[in-house]
């Protein structure tokens, strides 16, 4: 092999090395799956039934607790749309979200309550801002009625 060719190949390899070794933190983490979402909802429903609202809501509101992972968190509304728990933002507790709409104007809290009350459990699809990457994306929340409470967990469905 000619000395120039060796130099050219060595240079190309050296230039590609930083790209190959670059940290992957800049890449978006994969979204949670429907199975992971359902598992967290099932866990939250079991907690609410076993421990009652006081202990369960405190656990759901704990940003470092077992009910918040990556993009998944538990939220709870009463039948009037008032937040009883929010793993995303506990400061929302006590605020009325009944008129909250998605990016396309869909009344998502009203629909979550209606689906849970009508069927006992179900899913609601909507368009929501993903704060991890500031993109508006399709989101799906799985909701379930437990007594007077609507418990939900949402994931970005791509």
What are these regions (language model features)?
Residues 2-4, 11-158:
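N-terminal membrane-sensor/transducer module of prokaryotic signaling receptors
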